[in-house]
């Protein structure tokens, strides 16, 4: 869309309920901390200004201000995982805890802060272990093996080099 329109940024209508659904999808699939940080409010080309607001708040605002609301017809079909979560799971969570969405937003903010902290630590660890010599990157395996728990470090340290499973990297250390 950016290339077609030559716009510098696209604004989406993602809101807090969408973020909760994304979190639950990622949680159900098994994910690391980055998968639990939810939908990013902004990237280089996408901004999500409605992310802090609930679907209910946005609908109320639209109604009060006579703004026409358009709902995607596929949103009602529970054959899609997101919609199943939206219609079957989230209402029960909100019923159990009426402040569930607000609590979730606080939790995601905490997880985002934690993710930043982890990334900074990983970068410092990488600077300590990785040495670039020309086109080659040398790694101190002895120092790498001292990291505990080792498996937590492997994916973030090596994923940008084409490794997608920490077990693959761990296997290299034992060969």
Description of each model-found segment:
Residues 1:
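Conserved acidic catalytic loop of the alpha/beta-hydrolase fold
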Residues 4-13, 18-107, 111, 119, ...:
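Catalytic subdomain that performs nucleotidyl-dependent activation
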Residues 42-43, 105-175:
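AMP-forming adenylation/ATP pyrophosphatase catalytic core
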């Amino acid at each position: 869309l950016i290339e077609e329109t030559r716009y510098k940024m696209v604004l989406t209508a993602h809101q807090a309920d969408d973020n909760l659904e994304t979190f639950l999808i990622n949680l159900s699939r098994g994910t690391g901390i980055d998968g639990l940080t939810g939908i990013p409010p902004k990237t280089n080309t996408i901004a999500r200004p409605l992310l802090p607001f609930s679907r209910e708040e946005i609908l109320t605002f639209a109604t009060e201000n006579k703004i026409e609301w358009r709902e995607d017809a596929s949103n009602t079909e529970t054959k899609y995982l997101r919609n199943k979560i939206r219609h079957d799971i989230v209402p029960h969570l909100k019923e159990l805890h009426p402040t569930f969405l607000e609590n979730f937003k606080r939790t995601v903010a905490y997880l985002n802060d934690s993710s930043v902290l982890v990334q900074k630590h990983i970068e410092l660890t990488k600077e300590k272990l990785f040495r670039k010599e020309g086109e080659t990157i040398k790694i101190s395996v002895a120092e790498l093996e001292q990291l505990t728990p080792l498996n937590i470090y492997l994916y973030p340290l090596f994923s940008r080099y084409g490794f997608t499973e920490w077990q693959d990297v761990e296997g290299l250390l034992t060969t």
